[in-house]
A protein has these predicted regions:
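Short beta-strand segments at enzyme active-site cores
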Residues: 14-15, 47-52, 85-92, 126-131, ...
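N-terminal pre-domain/capping segments
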Residues: 1-86, 115, 153-157, 232, ...
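Active-site acidic/histidine proton-transfer and metal-coordination neighborhood
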Residues: 41-42, 58-160
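Acidic-and-aromatic substrate-binding clefts and catalytic sites of carbohydrate-active enzymes
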Residues: 18-32, 56-66, 94-99, 134-140, ...
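Short acidic/histidine-rich active-site segments
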Residues: 202-204, 243-251
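Non-membrane alpha-helical structural segments and their capping/turn regions in soluble enzymes
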Residues: 30-34, 62-73, 100, 104-112, ...
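H/E-rich (His + Asp/Glu) clusters that bind or coordinate divalent metals
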Residues: 223, 230, 235-237, 242-246
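Acidic/histidine-rich catalytic cores of soluble enzymes
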Residues: 13, 50, 115-219, 224
Length: 274
């Protein structure tokens, strides 16, 4: 995979920290982790971030998030050892969980936990980025704005995935109760989140869900997004680094469209890159 991405002239890759990929449990020693870091560097690349495997943990429907924090801490050290500056989190549990736990308690629990995680990550020089999406709780625009404000840590921000932003802000997919969308869709959400976005995933959206769970990550040109409107706004977001990550999550035979997506992002970079 590393060699193939290097052949396509990628600058790096984003690591899913779960089997069969490199993860903190399988790479338990400093030597093993150093070898992975060196392998990527030898190919002329680096890691843009880590999607930490926190999905086996409970975050919303528990009064004790100690295990979640412990798992986060393990992944944060993994980031340090691999030279990764950004660690991704999400709400772990689906929006239907809010039928079991009252929303106020759930949000408070998420905010307090992520605040603690962000403080520990800051001590390690890491950014914490929250990927909101239809498939997880707190998937309304007002939820996103409120939670990032309440966590209120300099190294905590939002992962703005273009397809999730469209499904949340334009479609209102899987939102419990009254649907909440924005007239300007993803672009308006990006505008409202200026100064609060610290990571970006670029991919198209066809307005559908994958398996009725989370956003379909459609290759560029197969969706509804207007990147000529979105990218100028994202350039105003104040993201603290220059990574743009192509996200083909759940796309069948992703390798078949990776080169095409890379060319699409290269063109966006020529037009809007700093």
């Amino acid at each position: 995979m590393v060699d193939r991405l290097a052949d396509l002239r990628f600058d790096g890759l984003e690591l899913g920290g779960f089997k069969p990929h490199p993860n903190p449990d399988d790479l338990a020693t400093g030597e093993q982790r150093a070898a992975v870091r060196e392998r990527v560097a030898e190919a002329g690349m680096a890691f843009s971030g880590l999607a930490a495997d926190l999905w086996s943990q409970k975050l919303i429907n528990t009064t004790d998030t100690t295990d979640y924090i412990r798992c986060f801490r393990k992944n944060a050290q993994f980031c340090v050892d691999l030279g990764i500056r950004t660690i991704r989190v999400d709400c772990v549990q689906p929006p239907t969980i809010l039928a079991e736990v009252d929303e106020e308690s759930a949000r408070r629990r998420v905010v307090q936990t992520w605040k603690r995680c962000s403080q520990e990550a800051a001590d390690k020089g890491l950014w914490v980025t929250w990927e909101f999406e239809p498939g997880f709780a707190f998937n309304k625009p007002s939820d996103i704005l409120r939670i990032v404000d309440e966590v209120d840590e300099d190294n905590f921000g939002v992962l703005f995935d273009a397809c999730h932003a469209h499904m949340v802000a334009a479609v209102g997919a899987r939102q419990p109760g009254r649907k909440e969308t924005l007239p300007g869709g993803a672009v308006e959400l990006a505008r409202r989140l200026r100064g609060k976005i610290n990571h970006i995933h670029l991919i198209d959206s066809d307005g559908t869900l994958h398996d009725n769970e989370t956003s379909t990550h459609a290759p560029f040109g197969e969706g509804e997004l207007n990147f000529d409107e979105l990218l100028p706004e994202l350039n105003k977001a104040g993201v603290p680094h220059d990574w743009w990550t192509i996200d083909l999550c759940f796309w069948p035979d992703a390798w078949a469209v990776t080169e095409r997506c890379k060319k699409a992002v290269d063109e966006l970079n020529r037009k809007y890159g700093g």
